[in-house]
Amino acid sequence: MIDFSFPPEIEDVRLKVRRFMDTVVRPEWESIDQHDRSQVVATIVRLRAVARDEWGLWLPHMPAEWGGMELGPTAMAAVSAEAGKVSIGPYVLNAQAPDEGNQHTLLHWATPEQKEKYLRPLCEGKSRSCFAMTEPEVAGSDPTLIKTFAYQDGDEWVINGHKW
């Protein structure tokens, strides 16, 4: 028989995230007007500080040198499953799309200068990133179909394409 249980260290972090979501995040989320963007943003900002400073739950996917928890794929799956039970959960842990993927991209391929300019503020929760995928000529959400491209023209970059 196959044992599908998590190793103790992963189960510990999974349960910690569950407790945090159940005792802190969900009550806050349910107490606000979820259609009022200013309340939603203020709640996320406030809970991010609690997650990071009081619970040690911050950037579960990133290395410690960037303030993260250095969790591997299995632990990230467990954390994501628990955080996703409250719609703002991934935002509170600074592990939401597209920032999580963009943090990985910057971590592995950015220059040191780019990391300081773009990755550090993302990891500190001071900025957000975006991904302009949709185009009028291409239906769907498959980024491999993106037609827009950039090319260097002297000292400048030219973006050629259409976005909605």
Where are these regions (language model features)?
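Short, solvent-exposed polar/charged micro-motifs at secondary-structure junctions
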Residues: 41-44, 71, 103-104, 140-143
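Amphipathic, small/basic residue-rich leader segments at the start of a protein or domain
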Residues: 1-96, 113-128
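Short hydrophobic "helix-edge" motifs at membrane interfaces and signal-peptide entry regions
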Residues: 53, 101-102, 151-152
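N-terminal glycine-rich flavin-associated loop
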Residues: 91-113, 142
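Glycine-rich, Trp-frequent "lid" loop and neighboring beta-strands that shape
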Residues: 69, 109, 113-164
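Active-site phosphate/pyrophosphate- and oxyanion-stabilizing loops and adjacent acidic/basic residues
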Residues: 77, 104, 148
